[in-house]
Structures are given as C-alpha cells and as structure tokens.
Amino acid sequence: MSPSAVSATPPQAVVQGNPDLSADAVKAKLASNGQPTLAALDASKLTRTRTTTPRTVPALDDPIRNVSSFATDHMVTCTWNVNTGWATPELKPYGPFSIMPTASVLHYATECFEGLKAYRGYDGKLRLFRPDCNARRLLMSSARIALPTFDTAEVEKLIKELVAVDGAKFLPKSDAGKFLYLRPTLIGTQAELGVQTPKEAMLFIIATYMPELSETPGGMKLLASQNDTVRAWPGGFGFAKVGANYGPSLMAQQEARRLGYNQVLWLLGDEAQVTEAGASNFFTVMRSKEGKMQLITAPLGDKVILDGVTRRSVIQLVKERLTGSKELEPIEVVERQYTMGEIVEASEEGRLIECFACGTAFFVAPVSKIHFRGVDIDVPMAQGEIGDYTNTIKIWLVDIMYGREDHPWGVVVEEKEV
C-alpha cells in the first residue's frame, strides 16, 4: 500500500482502545490491516476556478481587519465518501456551500479543525510556521471523532496552494510583519439522523484576517474556573482540536469578560490542577524551593490539554537555547501536573516570576493577574508589559515566522502573483 492510500477501515476501529492517537500511529494502523483501499486525498489533482468577483482588499486601518469574518477570494474544498474515498480537491471562489439540515456535523459535533497563519516576512517572502504539525494534528483529531483519514502531506500542499493564490493580494509585500489566519476544517456531512460514523465528509480550507491578540495592554487577566466548571478531563477529548471542546466553554468565558477578565484559566479537580488559559496553552515561570528556575506547563500524557504547535515550539526552543543561557538565568523545562496552590505559594514566597499563554490566535501573551477563589494573584512582568523569559521566547518565534532567522520551521510558500 502506498503511504497516501486510505484503508476502508472506519476510523473508530483504529482508535478504539488505543491510547496512542498520534498521526503516525493512526496512519500505521490504517496501512497495516490489509483492507481494500479507497481513493486517497491527492493535492496534485487540484482543480482551480478563479473568482470572477474579486474582493477589495481593506486598508490596514479598516476595522474589518479586526474581526475574523473577512475572507480572501478563494477556498479549497474536497469531499469524501465511504464507498469511493476522496474526490478531486477544488480551489474555487470563497462562498457558501450546501449541506442538508440532517447533516451529521449539525447534530453530533462531527467536526475538527486547525488554526495556523501565513506570515509576510520582512524579507518579502510568505511563510507558514510548521504546517506539518497542524496537518498531523488534524489527522489525529479526525480519527478521534471517526472522520476520514488522509495523507497529511496532501493537506499541507492544499494549504500552501490557497496561500500561494491569495497571499500576494491579501498579504502584499507592503504588509511586512502582518499575517492571514488559515482554517482547515473537516466536517461530517452525511444527511441522516442517528449517532453513527459519518459516511460522507468534507474538508475545506479558508483564509481570513484576524486581529493581533497577543498585545493586551497591561497583560492578560485570567479568572480561574470553579470546581463545577470543567473544560476537559482525563480520557476525554481535550487533546483533540474538535469543536465540541469550545462551545461548552463560552458561558464561562462570557462570565469572565463580564467581570473584567480576558480569559478563563481552566483548572481540573479538587486540587485545582492548572491546564489551559482560554483556548491556549499556559506556562508558568517560577523558582523551585531548591532555587532552580523552571518553566512549567501541564503534560500531554493524560490527554487533557491540546498539543499546541506554539507550545511544542516554546519547549523545544527553551531546551535548545535557555538551559545553558548566559543572557538569562538558565531555566529547566518541566512538563507535569501542577496546581494553583503551587502558584499561590510561589507568589507569597516571591518565587513566581512570569506566566504566559500561547497558541496560534493569542501567540505569546503575558499574564499579569490571576483571580483564584476570591484572591487576585499579581504576576510579575519584569519589563512592565512583559516578562524577560516571555519576551525572549516571543522574539525568537517572531524572527522565525517573519524570516529574520533562517529556520526550517519557517516554510516559504512560492506565491502566484496577481
């Protein structure tokens, strides 16, 4: 079987009873069962239909750029059927598509998605940041909710194609330091009620403008969740990027904003384990009682938090560049369960150094305050608006994303001039 061939085995059979839901593991299981193959997702077959009603690019100061509703001229779509596999992918004008009211996604949350950005570099080039990681995570999420599998390299190619076509117009070279937000999404479209594995699905990829969310004046203020409000739990699906993780969190988020906070700091269990901040991963810099500087974040092993691409990158860069640093005090990366009690104690003892949230949307956002059980915990920020470690990490990532540093994570897209 070729690497891109897709087995007829339904995805739920692949993942049931298997704790290893990595993209590689899913593909290996699919490729080894000897079942007949269906048509694979194949980006080389992409058809292209250019829009006849091109949109006007909004000015840099146009408020429409500060919401995520203004999309570029085109989108990529591809349908899937259990009997035939993947159809021919299409690049076509952005606009509505039709699904039936009985479509699986509308009733049973058979939906997963990714979020990544296309960056206009200071050298004039268009880049993606580690798109292979996003494609692999989309595959993992798809398998978790019994949607079809695919070769991740083909999804990556389709993402690049959309950026290549629309990037030059909507992210011109004059917009150095700006970005477009990309949203690959996979939905179950079978038009039949009933809790069952969808026999039809659709992949689509769109690009929109998005506001800069990492520069909250004074730092982000977080409201710690209550014991009776849980975002994710061991054995659940908090590790997968599925829509069902986000809708149920909106009520708590709305309450946090009503009270003057930016996001919810999601806790778990009676011990108030720290997990995520809003829809972002969360890091704490604190000095241990033994005097060692540590960068602490929740682990992936219990599958409560998302394996964020930014999170993964932060950990890798810190291990490579800060464990023996001369510019900043060397710091140890620690992935473990930790609690709000530890943060409170560190704050009281002067050992709490910094906190930050990170993800594609919020990038690297410093945290200045956490409200926990009636008490405001002030988080130090050495430079007034951002801490030293947070700032250093943010600069490293910006340099890679926008081409100031030549790095394999910054993937150049050969754009098609308009």
Model-predicted segments: where are they?
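A short glycine-leucine-enriched loop at secondary-structure breakpoints
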Residues: 260, 307-309
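Glycine- and Gly-Pro-enriched alpha-helical subdomains that act as flexible
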Residues: 273-305
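Nucleic-acid-processing active sites and adjacent nucleic-acid-binding tracks
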Residues: 311-314
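Conserved alpha/beta cores of soluble small-molecule-handling proteins
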Residues: 2-263, 267-273, 316-418
